[in-house]
């Protein structure tokens, strides 16, 4: 099986069309900008600090998380299959003076010559956009050093997540373009843990994220019934 087969061309095209608005704080990616400080803090705190560490951001898109990790001292590589988002990411990094290496490649292909290379790997809101999440998770595991951390975020699959992320965020609040998400591709925490358990990763922590449309604020929650992140660590 070729490594580029774990790509959904429609998903790539979807984010290519939105690339030019990636760094518009009030544009289509506003939710990612609002959510990013929580993600960055969770990654930095759970991994024991990422300053000076080699970090790979899988599915980096336009570089929102990648840049924030680089700003606090991580050595960041960003990986994506969308050429337009990567061009936006490279340009923005030049404008802001942040040193990041952006690569157009799949996680599976990149892992071939980066076995045990990174201290931390992040894979945020990406698993629900690929045909084979297990393949991506394995590649992330292969690329992190023993004892290193891999972080995943995705969306639970249930009635509440459908109401909040699709009916609410896409149709009612217009926070995201209609069609951004496919509820059938959402992943239950139990399913994600099972996929992780098929690798040398061990789940160390899980946290939910909730959004208050009245205040426009994201915050952590112990509930993982909609958006959630998990922290995993590779067995030594």
UniProtKB/Swiss-Prot annotation:
One MF annotation (Gene Ontology) recorded for this entry: polyprenyldihydroxybenzoate methyltransferase activity
Binding site for S-adenosyl-L-methionine: 39, 59, 80, 124
GO biological process, one term: methylation
InterPro entries documented for this protein: SAM-dependent_MTases_sf, UbiG_MeTrfase
Superkingdom to which the source organism belongs: Bacteria
EC main group: transferase
SUPFAM superfamilies: S-adenosyl-L-methionine-dependent methyltransferases
EC number, UniProt record: 2.1.1.222, 2.1.1.64
CDD domains noted in UniProt: AdoMet_MTases (cd02440)
Pathway membership, UniProt: Cofactor biosynthesis; ubiquinone biosynthesis
UniProt KW keywords: Methyltransferase, S-adenosyl-L-methionine, Transferase, Ubiquinone biosynthesis
Catalytic activity, reaction form: a 3-demethylubiquinol + S-adenosyl-L-methionine = a ubiquinol + S-adenosyl-L-homocysteine + H(+); a 3-(all-trans-polyprenyl)benzene-1,2-diol + S-adenosyl-L-methionine = a 2-methoxy-6-(all-trans-polyprenyl)phenol + S-adenosyl-L-homocysteine + H(+)
Family: Belongs to the methyltransferase superfamily. UbiG/COQ3 family.
Function: O-methyltransferase that catalyzes the 2 O-methylation steps in the ubiquinone biosynthetic pathway.
Protein name: Ubiquinone biosynthesis O-methyltransferase
UniProt organism field: Shewanella putrefaciens (strain CN-32 / ATCC BAA-453)
